[in-house]
């Protein structure tokens, strides 16, 4: 049965589920939703996700939203991949870092994404707000220190094996340069992201995200 992914490819939340599918070799059909045109705010899309957010997975009659849940569902199709961990403690550690991303890392990165990318390019609503940037910078450094420390002595977030935690947290780093993340002091984060970016699945997903919508669909 075909796995359909409703995504807006520039979003890190879309990227992470697309990258997991690519890494696992799961064939998917991408359904591109244009956020600036309001395509998530239609009755048809609300029937898929009442929150009117992407990404959404649809497989037959089964519909799942929230990127973390989608990633776990995809990884569950290929448990031998190790993306979910091999033991209960490993799975809990991976889940902990996925939740850390939702609670801390993603909101910190989102400040920069909104101020430097969404406002000027999508909303066309003016210059970045210095107060918002100052608050975002404080948040970013608080949590970048945590992540940098966690990566010290580890190839990936939870150890020597690639897991869903890496896809969850690493996706935002794709926009670090245009969104001006203050990541320069964090050598472990930069080293780790370089490892992720070199993955074939990561490269394939970056290429998909660069496609025109019609071609990607």
Which residues make up each language-model segment?
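Phosphate-coordinating loops and pocket residues in cytosolic domains that bind phosphorylated ligands
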Residues: 47, 85, 169, 198, ...
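GST-like fold's C-terminal all-alpha helical module
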Residues: 98-198, 217
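Active-site-flanking alpha-helical
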Residues: 20, 75, 172-173, 206
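GST-like domain detector, emphasizing the conserved glutathione-binding G-site
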Residues: 1-131
